[in-house]
Amino acid sequence: MARGEQQRGEGGQRRDRRDRNAPEERVDSDIVEKLVHINRVAATVKGGRRFSFAALMVVGDQKGRVGFGHGKAREVPEAIRKATEEAKKTMIRVPLRESRTLHHDGAGRWGAGKVMMRAAPPGTGVIAGGPMRAVLETLGVQDVVAKSTGSSNPYNMVRATFEALKVQSSPRQIAAKRGKKVGDILGRRADGASAPEAIEG
């Protein structure tokens, strides 16, 4: 706890505004690590039950790259280490609009978990709960409105969030794919937030 308080103090005003109930956060060089969930797992073996811990971690550079990992071990620190290593190996790049929000609205699903995300104007903040907030903040999103329905399982919510992020496309990417100019794509985004053309592409 002391370490977290020290990081908030060194991080300045921006960190002071973060939700105190947010997942535990660690900073490793340029990579931010967040422990989303940890639970104890029991396996029945000959002679009794064997207990271990499963950790779900999210890592990112807060500049458009993010990944998640799941690790299991008999001790909590080892489970976190394994999950962190896996998360760093599976990082994806997501284009961000103005380095602060999504380029267009999106939705994702994994198992019984469903998420919906909407780009938002400056000053909105990250309006999302639990696992979704961890992913979006670690990615570097500063303004977004997100909602989850269905399963509240942290793993399903994280996977659903990643599925929604994978379909994000910048105007440049869409223009290249369709053989058009960037201006043609931007001209169809008069509302500045939602881009149906982008979602379809």
Swiss-Prot record:
Originating organism:
Caulobacter vibrioides (strain NA1000 / CB15N)
Q: What is known of its domains?
A: The N-terminal domain interacts with the head of the 30S subunit; the C-terminal domain interacts with the body and contacts protein S4. The interaction surface between S4 and S5 is involved in control of translational fidelity.
**Which protein, by its recorded name, is this?**
Small ribosomal subunit protein uS5
Query: Briefly, what is this protein's role?
Result: With S4 and S12 plays an important role in translational accuracy. Located at the back of the 30S subunit body where it stabilizes the conformation of the head with respect to the body.
One of the record's GO cellular component terms: small ribosomal subunit
Location of the region described as Disordered in the Swiss-Prot/TrEMBL record:
1-28, 173-201
- The gene that this protein is the product of is rpsE
* Annotated GO biological process: translation
- Biased composition, Basic and acidic residues: where in the chain? 181-191
